[in-house]
């Protein structure tokens, strides 16, 4: 393993994530949401920063995920809050695809 591979962990199989969809998964004890948008893959924490709800149960509209509990909206690229009641941004994670594996870096 070279230095470029440090910190990367498997999040899901690429075939499990459909374009325009969100997939919730557990990675090393972290709840992660994976998104496939415009042939790119993004990763954020899967728990809304306003109240405990899985974003993977919400609605994905382009690059925006809406929380199913109180309709807070976040930009999946940056994690930025777009609409209240959330006031805290989501944590985002670097993503890469290696073969059929989606990998994220947690550090």
Model-derived regions, located:
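Short cysteine/histidine-rich metal-coordination sites, predominantly Zn2+-binding motifs
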Residues: 62-68, 81-90
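Short cysteine clusters
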Residues: 48, 67-70
């Amino acid at each position: 393993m070279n230095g470029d591979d440090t910190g990367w962990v498997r999040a899901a199989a690429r075939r499990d994530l459909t374009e325009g969809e969100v997939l919730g998964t557990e990675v090393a004890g972290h709840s992660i949401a994976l998104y496939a948008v415009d042939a790119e893959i993004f990763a954020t924490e899967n728990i809304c920063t306003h109240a405990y709800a899985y974003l993977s149960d919400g609605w994905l509209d382009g690059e925006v995920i809406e929380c199913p509990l109180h309709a807070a909206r976040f930009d999946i690229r940056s994690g930025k809050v777009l609409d209240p009641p959330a006031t805290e941004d989501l944590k985002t994670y670097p993503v890469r695809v290696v073969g059929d594996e989606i990998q994220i870096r947690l550090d």
